[in-house]
Amino acid sequence: TKNLIIMLLLVTAFYFASTSYNSSINYYIEDVLNLPPTFIGGFLAVVGILGFIANLTFTPLLAKHFKEVNVCKVITLCLSISLSLMILFKNTTLFLTSAIIFTTFASIHIPLQQSIITKLSKGNYGSLMGVLNSSKAIGQVTGSLLAGFIFDLGNKLPFLISALIILIAFIIMLPMNSNVTESNIV
């Protein structure tokens, strides 16, 4: 269906941005911010823990009180905004705070994607999971490849392109009806 195609495009865009971010953030912190590898490890550990906590606490609350499609739209926009803030901020603390916000929203976004797509599948889980994994793989490969090629051209370019890709995915997602998943629950 149209909504399923939109969601698969969103998955591809999300994994493009996420992988581009993951491929670039370590180099950016070390090369541009001149912070040591021990800081990078500590930062990534803190970010992972915060994402885990956000996923455990906010994802069930948001899903309980709001329609999943609407939450997914808002979080998709927040992902684009947080990446955009990373581009704008020259201050190290503000840049890293934006990175934390991005990864926290990303950790909430993944279960929402999976839930919406599962509900849109109409019981055809096996083949749909194959298509879902292909969408993820396309995003991961292209995100990593592009980030690697363009980082030397501009160290914030991977974040900029990721912000734009996610913004385009948000715009594509706008026509989705917020009730689209409720009528498809098996």
What are these model-predicted stretches?
Residues I108-S121:
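Intracellular juxtamembrane helix-capping segments at the cytosolic ends
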Residues N124-L153:
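A late C-terminal transmembrane helix in Major Facilitator Superfamily
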Residues S162-V186:
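Multi-pass alpha-helical transporter architecture, strongest
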Residues S23-F39:
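Short amphipathic helix-loop junctions that connect adjacent transmembrane helices
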Residues A13-N22, A106:
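Conserved extracellular-gate-facing transmembrane-helix segments in secondary transporters
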Residues N70-L85:
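Structural signature of the two symmetry-related core transmembrane helices
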Residues I87-S98:
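Helix-loop junctions at membrane interfaces in 12-TM secondary transporters
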